[in-house]
Regions:
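Polar, enzyme-active/binding microenvironments
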Residues: 1-100
């Protein structure tokens, strides 16, 4: 699955959509993020879980929240914890064992 979350359309949204990468087609509703935000600090994933952190609410500044969801089933984001500082538009990376 490919997953898309948050954004601005025309207001900040909390929508999570997904596509099945093996087939052509439109995005389908996956669930909702824990809050509406945009410009998240990237994402990282394992084979089973996707994690995103940071971002912006409107109109407030950057946030420090981290949330995750499981690829196998559709559903809403779940609180994972907090970043050490509020930030947005950063980068993250991961391998099969952990993320930075």
């Amino acid at each position: 699955r490919g997953v898309f979350a948050g954004g601005w359309s025309p207001n900040v949204v909390n929508i999570i959509d997904y596509i099945t990468t093996a087939t052509l087609g439109n995005a389908v509703d996956f669930g909702d993020m824990t809050e509406a935000k945009y410009s998240m600090s990237g994402s990282m994933s394992s084979k089973t879980r996707m994690v995103i952190g940071g971002g912006h609410r409107n109109p407030s500044p950057a946030v420090n929240t981290i949330e995750y969801w499981e690829f196998a089933t559709t559903g809403n984001g779940t609180d994972f914890g907090d970043l050490s500082a509020a930030k947005s538009s950063g980068g993250q990376c991961s391998n099969a064992h952990g993320g930075l």
